[in-house]
Amino acid sequence: MIYSQVPCRVAGTFTTNLVKAAPVLWDRDIVKNSDYAQAVVVNAGIANACTGQEGLDYCQKTADQAAKVLGIPASAVCVASTGVIGKQLPIDRIMAGVDALAPKLADGVEAGNAAAKAIMTTDTHEKEVAVTFEIGGKTVTIGGMCKGSGMIHPNMCTMLAFVTTDLAISKELLQEALSV
């Protein structure tokens, strides 16, 4: 789970595949209708793709549960899934996982590394980076992690990537940076 104590600008790039997993539809809606998000719940093992209305309902349930334990609106919770296509999520395990993770949320190098490892499927090693630098007289940090970089056709198909920053940036500029 990725969480910010304050609402963050949200932007996204999504697969162009005709078949889109429920979390893609959920997150695309958040990016379209909101300037901010505050959490991302990620599961690895089952993609929640080709799961129909039940898959969409599971996105809602996941967001509702995260919102409840984190004290934020469900509309500020993105959901991401990776893994086997066509299987339903074990929603009871997802809910229990959200409950278990919330009090253990942490920041720093070790927490970032653990999160990057947790989203791996067929990856051979975690992919993460964080850089701190000065811009306009202020120190800012940009961090990122991803999985599935070997299977990205068509355009982001099975790849999950997350970028975080404390940089004050407009939604439009953030979206442009992700779309280059």
Question: Which stretches of residues belong to each language-model region?
Answer:
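Short coil/turn segments at secondary-structure boundaries
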Residues: 46-57, 85-89
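Glycine-rich oxoanion-binding loops at beta->alpha junctions
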Residues: 14-36, 123-134
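N-terminal amphipathic/basic leader segments beginning at the initiator methionine
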Residues: 1-19
